[in-house]
Swiss-Prot record:
Family: Belongs to the WD repeat DCAF13/WDSOF1 family.
Cellular localization per UniProt: Nucleus, Nucleolus
Major localisation: nucleus
Residue stretches of each WD repeat: 65-105, 113-158, 177-214, 217-257, 259-299, 303-342, 346-385
Assembly notes: Interacts with snoRNA U3. Interacts with NOP1 and MPP10. Component of the ribosomal small subunit (SSU) processome composed of at least 40 protein subunits and snoRNA U3.
Species whose genome carries this gene: Saccharomyces cerevisiae (strain ATCC 204508 / S288c) (Baker's yeast)
Sequence ranges of Basic and acidic residues compositional bias: 440-459, 466-489
Molecular-function GO terms, alphabetical: mRNA binding
Encoding gene (name): SOF1
GO biological process: maturation of SSU-rRNA; maturation of SSU-rRNA from tricistronic rRNA transcript (SSU-rRNA, 5.8S rRNA, LSU-rRNA)
Protein's recorded name: Protein SOF1
Record keywords: Nucleus, Repeat, Ribonucleoprotein, Ribosome biogenesis, rRNA processing, WD repeat
Length: 489
């Protein structure tokens, strides 16, 4: 006689440690869970509501800010919590983002600080006593570029309560004099070269007082420039003639040029994809380009109602942040044309500078009200230490929100944002104008059969130019073609 019994092993559900939880037996057969999708939808809806409830993006401002507008911000690529800012009164401040206090400040220039960058420590490898130091380059419309030492240990005895103390010559290493006002500055990642904009692009070496060479390709005035952080010999610049020019320092010459309908205010390279870059334009949009094909943009980032003044990439390479003259900050995913987030405050004025922190968790903005503000890149995220259960719950909620993001109620709640009345009214007027233009083009295309359709990603492009060095084989082939043409004639 056989007797069937139920056998259970305590090893399957009794925890080994006191910190572990008892394992619950689960049967994953879908026939036993007919309401699984309904339960998950409810969880996704609750997670979306909680996300909007906990959305508090503003962290605080750095110190007492500046006395004038903030028009230059530079990240320290070798540190997570250090930042440099420059204002219109010529003062530069170096900040500790952890404590939100300044390390040191300099009365650097007698005019507007137009460019700022924190250099790599290898700048002065020839001098052993300067190997471990950090340096900063600043330029201004007073026709000078200055190299500063920002080694934190040298300023550790500075009185933190004296927030108005500004050093003049302390920390200054070298001054470079130019012939005209400078607009924008950036340093090479691997050597002691740096580039400045203005009437021309000048290449400098920190060990020389005069420029090593200059680059130009028909631009009226260079407004901004940026080195590629991966392909370090590639330099991109924007000009006042609505042009974007790419240079190769290995040949010391320009390679490509694109002309747009309106001026570009800022440019930034993708840190993960060395051939892609994004531009901030006067036409209220930001454009994402591939340097291998500049005849069209990869994406167009819309939603701003005024000129986009600055743009920066997240260190992960999948998001960008823009600051606009409409007094707002927007965050975009690189594969989506509309912003996922908008930040604004009542006191914040025109935003001229935005930067991501090096851990992509925070955003720093500078506006012409003199404040340097710190924001969370994800408004609902908190930086506290989380237990394993909290992490698992947050990851589970993110997957649920991703799965049900197209459901009407979840989509409505996740997209809803409170925006200032001025921006909302401007958006309504802009939408009416754009719809009117589209309707007029549709009517015109109905009567004109030869009217071409121009893609949204090509409308801003007036033309592109390539400038390549001809090899001997190319010249020989061209001569043969010319000879064949003359014979045929």
């Amino acid at each position: 006689m056989k007797i069937k019994t139920i056998k259970r092993s305590a090893d399957d559900y009794v925890p080994v440690k006191s910190t572990q939880e008892s394992q619950m037996p689960r049967n994953l057969n879908p026939e036993l869970h007919p309401f699984e999708r309904a339960r998950e939808y409810t969880k996704a809806l609750n997670a979306t509501k909680l996300e909007r409830m906990f959305a508090k993006p503003f962290v605080g401002q750095l110190g007492y800010g500046h006395r004038d507008g903030v028009y230059a911000i530079a990240k320290n690529y070798g540190s997570l919590n250090k930042l440099a800012t420059g204002s219109a009164d010529g003062v530069i401040k170096y900040w500790n983002m952890s404590t939100r206090e300044e390390f040191v400040s300099f009365k650097a220039h007698y005019g507007l600080v137009t460019g700022l960058c924190v250099t790599q420590p290898r700048f002065h490898d020839k001098k052993p006593d300067l190997k471990s130091q950090n340096f900063m380059l600043s330029c201004s419309d007073d026709k000078t570029v200055k190299l500063w030492s920002i080694n934190v240990d040298d300023y550790s005895n500075k009185n933190s309560s004296d927030n108005d103390s500004v050093t003049n010559e302390e920390g200054l290493i070298r001054t470079f004099d130019g012939e005209s006002a400078f607009q924008g500055i950036d340093s090479h990642r691997e050597n002691s070269t740096f580039a400045t904009g203005g009437a021309k692009i000048h290449l400098w070496d920190v060990n020389r007082l005069k420029p090593v060479s200059d680059l130009s390709w028909g631009a009226d005035n260079i407004t901004s420039l940026k080195f590629n952080q991966n392909e370090t010999d590639i330099l991109a610049s924007t000009g006042s003639d609505n042009s974007i020019v790419l240079y190769d320092l290995r040949t010391n010459s320009p390679t490509q040029k694109i002309v747009q309908t309106m001026r570009t205010n800022a440019i930034c390279w993708n840190p993960m994809e060395a051939f892609n870059f994004v531009t901030a334009n006067e036409d209220h949009n930001a454009y994402y380009y591939d340097m291998r094909n500049l005849s069209r943009s990869l994406n167009v980032f819309k939603d701003h109602v005024s000129a986009v003044m600055d743009v920066d990439f997240s260190p992960t390479g999948d998001e960008i942040v823009t600051g606009s003259y409409d007094k707002s900050i927007r965050i975009y995913k690189t594969n989506h044309g509309h912003s996922r987030e908008i930040y604004h405050t009542k006191r914040m004025q025109h935003v001229f500078q935005v930067k991501y922190s090096m851990d992509s968790k925070y955003i720093i903005s500078g506006s012409d009200d003199g404040n340097v503000r710190l924001w969370r890149s994800k408004a609902w995220e908190r930086s506290n230490v989380k237990t394993t259960r909290e992490k698992n719950k947050l990851e589970y909620d993110e997957k649920l929100k991703e799965r049900f993001r197209h459901m009407p109620e979840i989509k409505r709640i996740s997209r809803h944002r409170h925006v200032p009345q001025v921006i909302k009214k401007a958006q309504e007027i802009k939408n009416i104008e754009l719809s009117s233009i589209k309707r007029r083009e549709a009517n015109e295309r109905r009567t004109r059969k030869d009217m071409p359709y121009i893609s949204e990603r090509k409308k801003q492009i007036v033309g592109t130019v390539h400038k390549y060095e001809d090899s001997g084989r190319d010249r020989k082939r061209r001569k043969e073609d010319d000879k064949r043409d003359t014979q045929e004639k």
